[in-house]
Amino acid sequence: MAPVSGAVRVLDTAAGRFRVELAGGHVIVARRVLAATGLVDRLPDIEGLARHWGVDVIHCPFCHGFEVRDRRVVQIVTDPIGLHPALLFRQLTDRLTLVLDGVEPGHPELDVLRGAGVDVVEGPVRRIVSGEHGGVAAVDLEDGTSIAADAIVVTARFEVRAAPFASLGLVPTPLQSGLGDHVETDPSGAT
């Protein structure tokens, strides 16, 4: 069978089969459909942040830690779950600053981080400042404080793009971590 491509207009089930109607007029009938639409990263709403996402604005010490080792890293914590990677980033650089933007300063983890030499600053972030070569240069706070940075860490929320599959009952449910949504599956990956 030759490959067929096109945007899905209608997706329904009948007699144990899936019927997929494509925008170009093709109709495909199949026993299984692989729902692979990906996720959308929802970033904190901070001026200048999105333009650096995936380059100088990162989220994971395992994915990006090697590239930011020994650099000035500012971690913007907008939710308590964002405290989790801080100790891991601290192992990669002794120039880590945590900015608590909307997170209570009394978290027990903060004492551990301060004891490990992490600077902790409280206050809302105003914007991310770009340097002359286009990379991140600083994090500006609402109170006028400017913190020099070579890289910024944030916690992104995951949004499942499940709308095309809603007619089949595939709807996103919240992750237990609070980091976004997912489509529940059984241990074999079936929905």
Feature map (PLM): residue ranges:
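A conserved short coil-to-beta-strand element within the FAD-binding core of flavoproteins
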Residues: V4-R17, E122-G134
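Glycine-centered tight beta-turn/hairpin loop motif at sheet-sheet or coil-to-beta transitions
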Residues: A23-G25, E142-G144
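Short hydrophobic core segments
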Residues: V27-V40, A149-R157
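Glycine-rich dinucleotide-binding loop and its adjacent helix/turn
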Residues: L39-A86
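Rossmann-like dinucleotide-binding cores of NAD(P)H-dependent redox enzymes
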Residues: I81-I128
